[in-house]
Amino acid sequence: MNKRERLAAAYNGQPVDRPPVALWRHFPGDDQDADDLAAAHIHFQRLHDWDFLKVTPASTFMVDDYGVQTAWCGNEEGTRDYVSFPVAQAEELTALAPLDVMTGSYALARRALQQICSAVDPDATVLQTIFSPLSQLKKLAGRRLLPLLRLHPQAVQVALATLTANSLRHIESLTTIGVGGIFYAVQHASAHQMSRAEYAVFGRPFDLQILQALPAGWFNVLHLHGADVYFDDVADYPVQAINWHDRETWPDLTTALTRFPGAVIGGIRQWDTLLRGAPAQIRTEALDAFAQTGGQRFILGTGCVAPITAPAANLRALRQAVETMPSHRPAAHRMQD
């Protein structure tokens, strides 16, 4: 099987020659320049030969042009620290103007993607990271997000509509350069962030506007960030795979397969195992994840980005783990009614 065939078989629940596998990471410093960002991803893909390549621009790339100020301070995830947030008042929410996605930070990301798609194995699906509109607004408002949301809900809705429209224009601009899907990052579908009722109003409608507009044939991944996620609330999203911190929070892989019809991505602890563990632990967790799923609708990975300081031996061990796994065996994972 080639990579695209393997991915399609995995998310459709069909036999695979081996489980697909992928890791992704930030490239701090390199993410400030299109050529450097592209070169880093191209090298990463050629080194490890992942079944798909998730491109990871700076986490604020969708809102940088609104005036977000950040600095690289050494975070092990590779993310930049916030220096200042441009939104603090309701009137600043409604004043957010549409962005020209062919200029500025959006354009930087697109130029990098164009180089990546031209350089990597055409059999490898390239995914662009897209942050949900609510996640984008958090990057603009910081800790002011929830007070604004609760005190000025209409102004928040206006801002979310603007950010959604920006996102859709950016995605449309990617359809001609070889991108094969998106990695859609949701950071607020969690009991630690807001209530289910709040997410139903300020998260889900805007998520669906984006996900329902994606081109047919793309491979799209939903990422649920954090603990105590509202998995069941998003299990009907029109995506081919879901990724979450399966080793740290409910549901486990087995349970998720009964609630979501596509593929599940995970199996390896991001910090305890990939960063601080040894290759033998990687192999043990990978085999356990295979056992949980029977290798069916299963893609080996971690719950989030690979720490930039993770040992190279651990990344190699994760990539090599699938080579010794059999094709999937029938498993009794049935969707719940």
What are these regions (language model features)?
Residues 1-28, 40, 100-337:
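Active-site loop segments of alpha/beta catalytic cores
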Residues 15-88:
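N-terminal capping/small domains of soluble enzymes
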Residues 29, 91-95, 320:
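Polar/charged alpha-helical tracts
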Residues 77-115:
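A gly/proline- and charged-residue-enriched helix-loop-helix capping module
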